Amino acid sequence: MSDKLFKKRLENFSAKDEILAYNLAMVAEALDTVKELSDKNIGWEEVEKRLGEYKSWDPDILRVDKDTENGYRKRLEQWGIPVILLSEEAGRVEINTDKPGEPFYVVCDPFDGSYLFKHGVRDFWYSSIAFYDSHFNPICCCVGDCVSRKIAYACKNGAYLADIEGEKIVREVKLDKKYRQSMGRPDVTE
C-alpha cells in the first residue's frame, strides 16, 4: 500500500492521540489491502499451512491473511516503538524491542472471514488490531469492516463508528446512550 496515503491518514487522524491515529491508519490500510485483493479476484490462494493443533480445523493461511498481517507488521516496524505483536497467523513477534522503553502489546486478527473470502462470499470480512500498554491495560482497539469500509473503535474517550474515505474520516458517530436511543435500542449503561 501507499506510504504517502498512510502518512496522509496519520496527519488527518492526528487530532486523536498518536497510538489511536496509528491504529486507525493501520486498519484503514488493511481495508484497502482486502479491497484490492478482492477486486483483482486474488487473495484466496493458500500460501501456508498452520502447524500443530492451533486451528487444526482451519489449517489454510490465505494470501489475504498474510498480506494484511504483513501490512500490520511493516507499519509497526516503521513506527520504531517496541512492540510485542500477538497475531492469529504469526503468533508472538517481537518488533523494535532493541529500542528504549517498555513495549506495547499489539493483538490482531489481520483478516477474519478467510473461509468466506475463499468462497467469494462478500460478507463478514473484518480486520482488527488492539493496543495495550506493557501491563496489558487497554489503550485502543479498531475493528474494520472490509465490506462497508467502516471502522468501529474504542479508546479512553468512548466507542465510535467512523466512515473512512481515502485519507479522511468523513463521518464519525459516538456509540453512546444518544446513539442507542436513535437506533431504538434499550439503554445498557447506567
What name fits each language-model region?
Residues 1-108:
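N-terminal subdomain of lithium-sensitive/metallo-dependent phosphomonoesterases centered on the IMPase/IPPase/PAP
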Residues 69, 116-118, 149:
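General alpha-helical segment detector with a strong preference for membrane-spanning helices
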Residues 74, 118-121, 154:
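Hydrophobic alpha-helical membrane-insertion segments
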Residues 91, 112-115, 148:
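Short, glycine/acidic-enriched loop or turn micro-motifs at the edges of active sites
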Residues 97-100, 118-122:
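Short glycine/proline-enriched turns and hinge-like loops at secondary-structure junctions
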Residues 104, 122-125:
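Amphipathic alpha-helical segments in well-structured domains
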Residues 105-118:
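Asp-based phosphoryl-transfer active-site loop
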Residues 124, 128-190:
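Acidic beta-strand-loop-alpha-helix segment within the catalytic core
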